[in-house]
Amino acid sequence: MALEKSELGALLVMDTNNIRYLTSTKIGEWERDKICRWALLTKGSAEPILWDFGSAAVHHRLYAPWLKPENCKAGLLGLRGTVNPAFGLMERHAGEIAALLRDAGVAKMPVGIDIIEPPMLFELQKAGLTVADGQQTMLEAREIKSIDEIALLNRAAAMVDGAYHLVHEQLKPGVRENDIV
């Protein structure tokens, strides 16, 4: 809904929280700060496209029936600078993204991005795409919660409250944190 109301033609997200929101996938805490996965959602489509490590892409095809198998793609970008842009991964994926946007009829519209590595931003621009702020559109989308989301948030909050209560009961002078955990 937020994308449909915006001037954006698509959202390209690389923030793990936004990827989870658009695709209902998460591969673990280790990928949190790597900018190694990304998802694309075009205006007028309810089908996100997800790029992930090859083995994770295969896993999504097998165990994420809510995603179209052909929309679970293997991909790798710069891993926050550890893969040199000269290797060509960013250029290749920017071209792939531009082609998908052309196919969806939104390539001439701005692409909203939440976070990105600068070399990938430059490659998207070289591919002829106009890049815009997509963070606010994603935040607007995430404001609206279903009854199930609210129930899960309440359950998670209750679990945290319970954990803090147990810590509070055990915490006394002379007790070390690692003894409680």
How would you label these PLM feature ranges?
Residues 1-159:
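A composition/biophysics-driven feature that prefers long, compositionally simple stretches
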Residues 157-164, 177-180:
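Active-site pocket-lining segments that scaffold enzyme catalytic pockets across diverse folds
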Residues 114-118, 174-181:
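An alpha-helix initiation/capping motif
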Residues 165-175:
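C-terminal helix-coil-helix/basic helical segment that borders enzyme active sites and/or dimer interfaces
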